[in-house]
């Protein structure tokens, strides 16, 4: 099983618990979600609790993360969208921390689970719907009626807009899930090549050099992907929130 590249994604029960026929077991996925929240919160607290006039490197990282998301949200949803800053910043930090923790050997990558990424995506779209109807009432439905569309094409365009909106949770969740899943499987496969070829002695070690170089390169790429996927999720969240704030703006 250790050579199976998909074995790292198995969800195992740590504390079995069933109530009324519903499984509430505490799993390795649950453990690392708690660890992700703790790591992100702990990092931000430790780096900002004793802020100095001259920031330390870690304090600078925290402040840059804050400004990065604030600027992204301001550009994506305008000044009125800044009320969603805590939500977008929390999502970004959770996904980024989860992705980075998943790079540690023997750790579990929670963002490689479609149920986790889908829950995050549904939370985002649910927030868009709730705020959109709360703020604009039925005027929120203008989101599905683009300006300047000829009357004859309007029914078709509205149908396309509705389908596009309903597909957002799927595309948002699958993008993150698929990238993390594929990246970790690829790393596992190349690492397996290195281990297998090294077992053949000197000749095998020579043959393992290329897979080893590829593994190191892919590891560096995965760290980049870990940030990019958190960034993409945050950018799309800002774009979707803009639809809730300005439903007639497209």
Swiss-Prot record:
F-type ATPases have 2 components, CF(1) - the catalytic core - and CF(0) - the membrane proton channel. CF(1) has five subunits: alpha(3), beta(3), gamma(1), delta(1), epsilon(1). CF(0) has three main subunits: a(1), b(2) and c(9-12). The alpha and beta chains form an alternating ring which encloses part of the gamma chain. CF(1) is attached to CF(0) by a central stalk formed by the gamma and epsilon chains, while a peripheral stalk is formed by the delta and b chains. InterPro entries: ATP_synth_F0_asu (IPR000568), ATP_synth_F0_asu_AS (IPR023011), ATP_synth_F0_asu_bact/mt (IPR045083), F0_ATP_A_sf (IPR035908). This is ATP synthase subunit a. Key component of the proton channel; it plays a direct role in the translocation of protons across the membrane. Keywords: ATP synthesis, Cell inner membrane, Cell membrane, CF(0), Hydrogen ion transport, Ion transport, Membrane, Transmembrane, Transmembrane helix, Transport. HAMAP family: ATP_synth_a_bact. It is found in: Cell inner membrane. One of its GO terms (cellular component) is plasma membrane. Coiled coil: none annotated. GO terms for molecular function: proton-transporting ATP synthase activity, rotational mechanism. Belongs to the ATPase A chain family. The chain crosses the membrane at residues 26-46, 84-104, 114-134, 143-163, 193-213, 216-236. Its main location: membrane. It is a multi-pass membrane protein.
């Amino acid at each position: 099983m250790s050579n199976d590249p998909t074995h790292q994604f198995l969800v195992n029960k740590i504390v079995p618990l069933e109530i009324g026929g519903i499984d509430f077991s505490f799993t390795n996925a649950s453990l690392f979600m708690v660890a992700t929240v703790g790591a992100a919160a702990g990092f931000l607290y430790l780096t900002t609790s004793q802020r100095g006039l001259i920031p330390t490197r870690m304090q600078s990282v925290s402040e840059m993360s804050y400004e990065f998301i604030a600027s992204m949200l301001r550009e994506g949803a305008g000044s009125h969208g800044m009320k969603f800053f805590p939500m977008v910043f929390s999502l970004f930090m959770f996904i980024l921390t989860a992705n980075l923790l998943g790079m540690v050997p023997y750790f579990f990558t929670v963002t490689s689970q479609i149920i986790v990424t889908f829950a995050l995506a549904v939370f985002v779209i649910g927030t868009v719907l709730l705020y959109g109807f709360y703020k604009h009432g039925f005027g929120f439905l203008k989101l599905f009626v683009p300006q300047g569309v000829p009357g004859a094409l309007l029914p078709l365009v509205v149908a396309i807009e509705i389908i596009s909106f309903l597909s957002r949770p799927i595309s948002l969740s699958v993008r993150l899930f698929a990238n993390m899943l594929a990246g970790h499987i690829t790393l596992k496969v190349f690492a397996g090549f290195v281990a297998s070829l090294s077992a053949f002695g000197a000749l095998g070690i020579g043959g393992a050099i290329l897979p080893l170089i590829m593994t190191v390169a892919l590891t560096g790429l995965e760290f980049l992907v870990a940030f990019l996927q958190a960034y993409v999720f945050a950018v799309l969240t800002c774009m979707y929130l803009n639809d809730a704030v300005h439903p007639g703006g497209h």
